[in-house]
C-alpha cells in the first residue's frame, strides 16, 4: 500500500471510531419501498423514531426498527453508558440498491417477461444533535 493511501486509510479508520452506525445488507425488499420508511425517521430523536416505526404498517418498518436498536446498542457499547432520552438522533440514513435476482414469467405467444426481484442495503447513523449539525 502506498504512503498516501495508507495515511488516508488511517484517517478514515480514526473517523469511524467517532461514528455510531449499523448496516443491514441484502434486505429482500425493493429500495423504493425501504426509502419510504427511511424518510419517515430521518433526523428524528431515536425514541420517537422507534415509536413511529413500531406503529407503522409497512413491512420494512420492522427491519428498520431492529436496525435502529442495533445502532443505539453500538453507541452504548462505545460510550460505555446508556443513552438518555433526547440525547441521540438519527443523523443519517440511506438506502442503496443491492443485488437483483432476475426471473422469467411466461407470457403470451412464447415470450417471457423478466421479473426483477430487488434487494437493498440500509445504513443508519446515530449521534447527538451537535454531531448532526457538524456533519451538515
Swiss-Prot record:
One annotated Gene Ontology cellular component of this protein: cytosolic large ribosomal subunit
Top-level taxon: Bacteria
GO MF: rRNA binding; structural constituent of ribosome
Record keywords: Ribonucleoprotein, Ribosomal protein, RNA-binding, rRNA-binding
Keyword RNA-binding: yes
Pfam families registered for this protein in UniProt: Ribosomal_L22 (PF00237)
Coiled-coil annotated spans: none
RNA-binding as UniProt keyword: yes
Example GO biological process: translation
InterPro entries, per the entry: Ribosomal_uL22, Ribosomal_uL22_bac/chlpt-type, Ribosomal_uL22_bac/org-type, Ribosomal_uL22_sf
Secretion signal span: none
Assembly behavior: Part of the 50S ribosomal subunit.
Entry's family note: Belongs to the universal ribosomal protein uL22 family.
Function, as annotated: This protein binds specifically to 23S rRNA; its binding is stimulated by other ribosomal proteins, e.g. L4, L17, and L20. It is important during the early stages of 50S assembly. It makes multiple contacts with different domains of the 23S rRNA in the assembled 50S subunit and ribosome.
Family annotation (PANTHER family): CHLOROPLAST 50S RIBOSOMAL PROTEIN L22-RELATED, LARGE RIBOSOMAL SUBUNIT PROTEIN UL22M
Protein name from the UniProt record: Large ribosomal subunit protein uL22
Amino acid at each position: 500500500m502506498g504512503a498516501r493511501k495508507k495515511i488516508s486509510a488511517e484517517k478514515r479508520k480514526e473517523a469511524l471510531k467517532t461514528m455510531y452506525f449499523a448496516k443491514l445488507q441484502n434486505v429482500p425488499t425493493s429500495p423504493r419501498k425501504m426509502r419510504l420508511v427511511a424518510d419517515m425517521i430521518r433526523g428524528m430523536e431515536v425514541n420517537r423514531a422507534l415509536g413511529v416505526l413500531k406503529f407503522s404498517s409497512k413491512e420494512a418498518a420492522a427491519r428498520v426498527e431492529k436496525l435502529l436498536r442495533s445502532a443505539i446498542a453500538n453507541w452504548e457499547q462505545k460510550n460505555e453508558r446508556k443513552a438518555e432520552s433526547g440525547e441521540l438522533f438519527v443523523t443519517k440514513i440511506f438506502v442503496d440498491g443491492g443485488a437483483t435476482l432476475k426471473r422469467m414469467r411466461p407470457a403470451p405467444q412464447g415470450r417471457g417477461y423478466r421479473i426483477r426481484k430487488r434487494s437493498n442495503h440500509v445504513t443508519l447513523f446515530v449521534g447527538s444533535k451537535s454531531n448532526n449539525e457538524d456533519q451538515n
